């Protein structure tokens, strides 16, 4: 939360810093171009203008975005599964960004983990509904008009309400003449700015053009994913999937994460891994665990699909003089909580620009440390997913994980150690470092070892197979 006294104090510290490059600081009338009005671009604009208000700084912010998030299908979609973690919902609320009911599709009450050895439902920690399923656009292609609003559109409007100017244009190039940045658009127009913020994500051609603008720039490393939408209707979704996000731990090479997410009349499927292709998808759709989630065991045709690329390695460096990259364009969390990373990078970049400056050295000192922290955590995340891949390939390990989780959910007296690890992995609610350290706890290791043995006793059925696990039982 921002206070005027805090802003004035930080501005005073900037003024006292020696030496000060006044040519690369923001002043009254400075022009800022934000390229991309997804979550990172909209939140940057919102935070920048809000922070500027605390120090009586008048800025002219132009938010470039050719798409309209009120449109259904590809024209308004931002290619994302649309899950917002509980911790992020709380952080956004403290910033004055309270997600209204017409933006949230439904609260996720639980996660249901599907494996070939059985299923188990994992209740929300403390039984609080703080996981939100959202549409990044305004619904799938050919869908009926929705009585909801786009999450991206909601954030975009917050930026406009704070004072940003809408620029419905496609940016094709960004250049630096030493004194200012120039933004060039597909319609032939161009404009000069004191700062350009790249928030396009990694599915934009603009990222490639930046390689020629920054001599040492390495763009984000990416991988291909798959997202599609199924139309089932609210009543059928209630009967088959319920208010639960269905996650699959299957022995399919290169598949790191798969989930079905209920949203109103639709169900979103997300497949994440190492370059998702037709062979992998065929294996996934043919598995009994997936088919059994649909009515009659038949997977209906999808009404909308895409193969978006996601950032799996931070761009280096993600800044330059009068230039900074945020969200997926710069750094994001591995596989999960991309919207949370957009929030953190947007706020850090805005704070740097207002209270320190827009030179490359300013971003190196005050913005880049956050990027490095996220990147370091992602390295631990890669280790966590590598361990998960071993579990996927080992049937005896899946039995142990199933038994340990099922017992925790049925007996409130048992500490939910495995349940909390899985919950935070699925939701992205905690850093990978924290999740990994929990798996090193002696009690966690002892319980897992015991359940690996007990879950593989010949002739004994897994606990979750014997009776359904209800979310209200612990």
PLM features: residue spans?
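Predominantly flavin-linked oxidoreductase catalytic cores and closely associated redox partners
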Residues: 47-50, 157-294
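N-terminal FAD cofactor-binding segment of flavoenzymes
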Residues: 68-120
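C-terminal helical "tail/cap" subdomain of flavin- and related membrane-associated enzymes
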Residues: 354-474
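Glycine-rich Rossmann-fold phosphate-binding loop(s) that bind the pyrophosphate
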Residues: 37-38
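FAD/FMN-dependent oxidoreductases across multiple families
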Residues: 8, 104, 143, 173, ...
């Amino acid at each position: 939360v921002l206070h005027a006294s805090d802003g004035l104090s930080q501005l005073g510290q900037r003024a006292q810093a020696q030496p000060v490059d006044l040519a690369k600081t923001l002043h009254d009338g400075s022009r800022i171009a934000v390229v991309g009005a997804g979550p990172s671009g909209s939140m940057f604009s919102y935070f920048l203008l809000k922070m500027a208000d605390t120090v009586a700084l008048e800025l002219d912010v132009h938010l470039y975005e050719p798409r309209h998030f009120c449109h259904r299908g590809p024209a308004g979609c931002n290619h994302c599964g649309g899950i917002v973690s509980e911790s992020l919902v709380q952080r956004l609320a403290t910033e004055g960004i309270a997600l209204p009911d017409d933006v949230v599709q439904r609260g996720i009450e639980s996660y249901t983990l599907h494996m070939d050895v059985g299923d188990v439902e994992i209740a929300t920690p403390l039984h609080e509904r703080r996981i939100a399923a959202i549409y990044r656009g305004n619904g799938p292609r050919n869908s009926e008009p929705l009585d909801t609003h786009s999450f991206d559109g909601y954030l975009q409007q917050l930026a406009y309400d704070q004072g940003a100017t809408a620029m419905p244009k496609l940016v094709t190039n960004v250049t630096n003449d030493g004194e200012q940045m120039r933004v060039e658009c597909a319609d032939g127009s161009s404009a000069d700015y004191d700062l350009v913020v790249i928030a396009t994500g990694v599915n934009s051609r603009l990222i490639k053009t930046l390689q020629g603008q920054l001599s040492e720039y390495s763009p984000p490393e990416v991988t291909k994913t798959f997202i599609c939408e199924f139309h089932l209707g609210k009543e059928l979704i209630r009967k088959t999937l319920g208010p639960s996000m269905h996650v699959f731990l299957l022995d399919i090479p290169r598949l790191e994460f798969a989930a079905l997410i209920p949203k109103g009349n639709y169900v979103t499927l997300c497949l994440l891994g190492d370059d998702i292709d037709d062979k992998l998808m065929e294996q996934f759709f043919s598995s009994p665990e997936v088919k059994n989630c649909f009515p009659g065991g038949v997977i209906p045709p999808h009404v909308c699909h895409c193969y978006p690329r996601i950032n799996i390695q931070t761009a280096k460096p993600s800044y330059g003089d009068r230039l900074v990259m945020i969200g997926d364009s710069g750094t994001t969390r591995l596989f999960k909580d991309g919207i949370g990373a957009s929030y953190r990078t947007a706020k850090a970049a805005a704070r740097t620009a207002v209270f320190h400056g827009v030179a490359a050295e300013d971003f190196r000192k005050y913005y880049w440390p956050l990027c490095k922290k996220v990147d370091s955590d992602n390295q631990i995340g890669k280790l966590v997913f590598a361990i998960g891949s071993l579990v996927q390939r080992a049937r005896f390990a899946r039995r142990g994980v199933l038994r340990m989780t099922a017992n925790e959910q049925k007996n409130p007296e048992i500490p939910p150690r495995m349940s909390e690890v899985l919950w935070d992995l699925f939701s992205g609610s905690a850093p990978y470092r924290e999740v990994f350290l929990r798996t090193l706890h002696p009690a966690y290791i002892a319980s897992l070892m015991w359940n690996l043995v007990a879950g593989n006793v010949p002739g004994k059925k897994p606990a979750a197979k014997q009776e359904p696990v209800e979310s209200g039982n612990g």
